[in-house]
A protein has these predicted regions:
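Short, conserved DNA-binding cores of transcription-related domains
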Residues: 1-93
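Electropositive nucleic-acid engagement tracts
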Residues: 45-48, 52-53, 113-160
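Basic, short loop/linker segments at the boundary and entry of helix-turn-helix/winged-helix-like folds
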Residues: 53-111, 127-140, 156, 206
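RNase H-like nuclease fold core
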Residues: 78-81, 89-93, 128, 141-229, ...
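Metal-dependent DNA phosphodiester-chemistry modules and their immediately adjacent helices/loops
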Residues: 86, 259-287, 293
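Conserved beta-strand -> loop -> alpha-helix junction used to position metal-binding or nucleic-acid-contacting
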Residues: 226-233, 238-274
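Acidic/histidine-rich catalytic cores and adjacent linkers
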Residues: 244, 277-401
Length: 401
């Protein structure tokens, strides 16, 4: 697959060329299905001459240009020596992949369908019988494309990188285990969002995050101005080792949820009003004063709330140093939480994934579908950009932005 990408001048550079990626994925699936279709026609698979019971044989491929809503794509159509094979998936005079066919093919991946579901799908749509093991081999061809995407070059500087985790169950060595998929979503200096990477792991640690940070560095990221996280274990140490100047903002909304989840119903409204005086304060000095007042009022009943805010204040209070527009950008991890919600919509019917690879394939394709709509930038980006240039002037001088 890597050779295929190089030979056809397909290079995944910045994650935005979604149409090219979609065409390539459709081409891979169609060509795999056509080869399997010819196998069934001849009664034996390629190079399996022991089971050959016909005088007919394969005779290379012909190229056919198919029109799709993602643009034109070349498909290699297999031929037989006797000229008896008539492809059913792509008819002889068909030169367009219909919208329905495109959606069905891509939905087999992006909706996390099982190989059995896809087998039924192909039979229902095209009256083609393909075994689930064959479908697995075909879908596995997408993995090198995922690897290319994970290793693509990135921007030199990101204004903000959001880090979060989403959890799934995966079958591993006969057991069902919990896997965390760690997602890095960046906003570059032009205000454009991009998913920088998705990483499947078992648990958070400084070593794990260090490998991710080094990976971003190796892909060309020289600086991250601000990193927004949800209290991820080991992350502050890892990013300090690779990007020592990056400022860390812990998600305020997560902090509120985590610190108030055991507050009684009768107290929650008044307590939240007092807590809002802390995180919505105009300055850090005012916020600290309000935090002490909160302690005086509530510490006897809910001592863990003050302690949690006090212990994490260094990363919770970062946003106070920025102007209002930048505060709104980093105040919460809403940008990545919204993306995660869309992923969950796709995966909600899949309780257990058969492997890490199947999980990553599905998330990648869902990501391609979601991010194709990310064509613009925030409406207030002009104001944010101006403020970032002033605040981070020394770090941005000489950068190729």
């Amino acid at each position: 697959m890597r050779d295929y990408l190089k030979n056809n001048d397909i290079s995944i550079k910045d994650g935005t060329d979604v149409n090219s990626i979609m065409r390539d994925m459709m081409s891979v699936l169609l060509e795999g299905a056509l080869d399997e279709e010819l196998d069934e026609e001849l009664g034996y698979s390629k190079y399996d001459y022991r089971n050959k019971e016909t005088d007919n044989s394969r005779n290379g491929h012909s190229r056919k240009t198919m029109h799709t809503s993602y643009g034109d794509m070349d498909v290699a159509i297999p031929r037989d020596r006797n000229g008896e094979y008539e492809p059913q998936l792509i008819k002889k005079y068909q030169n367009a992949v219909t919208q329905d066919m495109e959606e069905k093919i891509l939905s087999m991946y992006a909706k996390g369908m099982t190989t059995g579901d896809i087998e039924s799908h192909m039979r229902e749509l095209y009256d083609i019988d393909i075994s689930d093991s064959t479908i697995s081999r075909i879908t596995d061809k997408i993995l090198p494309i995922v690897k290319e995407w994970q290793e693509r070059p990135l921007e030199e500087v990101y204004a903000v990188v959001f880090m979060d985790a989403i959890h799934y169950h995966v079958r591993s060595e006969g057991r069902i285990v919990k896997r965390a998929v760690y997602i890095a979503l960046g906003i570059d200096m032009n205000g454009k969002k991009d998913v920088l990477g998705m990483y499947v792991g078992e648990n958070e640690s400084a070593k794990f995050w260090l490998s991710i940070m080094n990976g971003l560095k190796n892909r060309g990221v020289e600086d991250i101005l601000i990193a927004c996280v949800d209290g991820l274990n080991g992350f502050p140490q890892a990013i300090e080792a690779v990007y020592p100047k990056t400022e860390i903002q812990q998600c305020i909304i997560h902090q509120i949820r985590n610190s108030t989840k055991f507050v009684s119903y009768k107290d929650i409204k008044k307590l939240m009003a007092d807590l809002k005086l802390v995180y919505a304060a105009p300055t850090e000095e005012t916020a600290l004063n309000e935090l002490e007042l909160f302690k005086d009022k509530w510490d006897s009943k809910y001592p863990k709330i003050y302690k949690s805010w006090h212990d994490n204040w260094a990363t919770l209070s970062t946003y106070f140093k920025y102007p209002e527009a930048v505060r709104r950008l980093i105040y919460t991890t809403n940008a990545i939480e919204g993306f995660n919600r869309q992923l969950r919509k796709v995966t909600k019917s899949k309780t257990v994934f058969p492997s890490d690879d199947s999980l990553l394939k599905m998330l990648y394709l869902a990501t391609m579908d979601i991010t194709k709509k990310w064509t613009g930038h925030r409406q207030d980006w002009g104001q944010i950009h101006s403020q970032l240039e002033i605040y981070f002037e020394e770090r941005l001088i000489g950068r190729n932005l």
